[in-house]
Amino acid sequence: MKARLRFNKMGSMMYIGHLDLMRYFQKLFRRCGLDVSYSKGFNPHQIMSFASPLGLGLTSIGEYLDLSLESFDYNGFDSEKSGKASYTADEWIDIINANSNGLVNVTGFRIMPDDIKPSMSLLSAATYRVEFEQTDIPGQIYDFFNENDELIYTKETKKSKKDIDLKANIPVIETSYELFAREMSSCAVFDYEYEKQYINDD
């Protein structure tokens, strides 16, 4: 049984890297009693994968996690929960969030078809929001982006150098002074389109 979870990663959890976040979920699911499938072999581990590892220092309101489940049954040590044969997806969301730290919250839980592709291969892009203390910076970035046909970045490795056109990978950039008014700061918004199939709950 395959499941797809959508979750937020906020606050000080921005300083937790991808591997530590994976370990966090492994312990969280064990604590919740979620009946997760394990790999076979000498060192079995929970079968899960992320759509796109989030960079260190970033928060997110829309991360995706693919998970293999044996069942929707409770598989833990709480005798009261063990009395119920199975839980719904919404009930599991409540159970997971109740056992989380308040900075990582599951906002969506859906059972997927067995032949569904991993979310990593379905996700085509993401939306980033950048905030600035100086209100004139977003406008400068917007003008610079639109005035140049290319934005070349030279990526250097130990063996070679490679020029990459950053603009080709940023379909839209816009500034907003109203959308995030509660933040009391202006920002630059990098808009992308998500792959619609099975990615969003909408």
Residue ranges of model-derived segments:
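Short glycine-/aliphatic-rich beta-strand segments at the starts of folded cytosolic domains
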Residues: 3-8, 67, 124-132
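Short, charge-patterned binding micro-sites
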Residues: 36-71, 113-115
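An aromatic-glycine-centered, glycine-rich loop/turn in mixed alpha/beta architecture
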Residues: 78, 83-202
